[in-house]
C-alpha cells in the first residue's frame, strides 16, 4: 500500500501526470526520518581521540550515502567512501570528514541533550538550504520543516519542565514522538490520480477504483446502502 511502499514508487512512474494524496503519510517512512536516525546513530558512536573526535565508519558511510548528503556533491561523497573502504578505517576523524560546510556541520560532536537538539536543528537547516532539483524537492523541504518544528517543540517542553536528561533519554523521546507523526496532505485540487485511505472512499464516485489493500471486514459500505 501507499504507506509501506512510500511515495517514491509514485514519482518513478513516468506515465502518471497529476497525483493527489489525501491521506496522511507516516513520517517514519520518509527519507527525512531516516536521515535523522542516521544522525542519531552517528552521535551515539562518536569517540574522543586526543584533541578531536572520531566517528564509526559504518555510520559515516550511511551519512555519505544518504540522498540528502550524496546529492550535494556526489563525486566528493563517493570518493570519501571509497577511501574509507580502501584504507579499512574503523574510526574516521571528524577533521578529515569536514570537506565542506555541510559535512563540517554534520560531523561535529553533540554530547548533552541540548547540544543534540541544536545539532539537529542546525543540520536540518543546512540540508534544507541545499539547491536540490527534482520532483521531490518541495516534499523534502516540507518533511524537514516538520521535523525541525517537532524538535523545537520538544526542546521547549523539556525546558519548561526544567529537568536534566541523559542524551539517551532525549533520543528515545524524540524517536517515539517522530514515529507517531503523519504528514498532512491538503488533498486539493481533485484531479489526476487520487491516493486515498480506505475510509475516505465512502463518499466518492469514481469511474475506476483500484483497491491496493484492505483488512477483512473493514471495507466501508457503499454510499447508497
Residue locations for each model-derived region?
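Polyanion-engaging groove/track-forming segments
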Residues: 4-5, 9-219, 225
Amino acid at each position: 500500500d501507499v504507506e509501506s511502499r512510500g511515495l517514491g514508487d509514485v514519482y518513478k512512474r513516468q506515465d502518471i501526470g497529476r497525483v493527489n494524496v489525501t491521506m496522511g503519510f507516516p513520517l517514519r517512512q520518509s527519507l527525512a526520518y531516516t536521515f535523522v536516525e542516521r544522525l542519531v546513530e552517528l552521535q551515539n558512536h562518536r569517540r574522543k581521540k586526543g584533541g578531536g573526535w572520531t566517528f564509526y565508519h559504518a555510520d559515516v558511510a550511511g551519512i555519505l550515502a544518504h540522498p540528502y548528503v550524496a546529492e550535494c556533491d556526489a563525486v566528493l561523497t563517493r570518493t570519501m567512501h571509497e577511501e574509507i573502504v580502501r584504507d579499512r578505517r574503523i574510526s574516521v576523524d571528524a577533521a578529515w570528514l569536514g570537506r565542506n560546510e555541510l559535512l563540517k556541520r554534520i560531523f561535529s560532536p553533540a554530547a548533552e541533550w541540548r547540544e543534540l537538539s541544536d545539532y539537529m536543528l542546525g543540520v536540518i537547516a543546512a540540508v534544507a538550504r541545499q539547491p536540490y532539483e527534482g520532483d521531490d524537492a518541495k516534499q523534502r523541504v516540507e518533511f524537514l520543516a516538520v521535523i525541525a518544528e517537532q524538535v523545537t517543540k520538544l526542546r521547549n517542553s523539556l525546558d519548561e519542565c526544567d529537568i536534566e536528561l541523559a542524551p539517551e533519554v532525549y533520543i528515545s523521546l524524540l524517536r517515539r514522538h517522530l514515529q507517531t507523526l503523519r504528514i498532512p496532505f491538503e488533498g486539493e485540487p481533485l484531479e489526476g490520480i487520487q491516493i486515498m485511505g480506505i475510509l475516505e472512499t465512502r463518499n466518492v464516485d469514481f469511474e475506476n477504483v483500484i483497491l491496493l489493500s484492505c483488512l477483512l471486514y473493514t471495507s466501508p459500505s457503499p454510499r447508497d446502502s
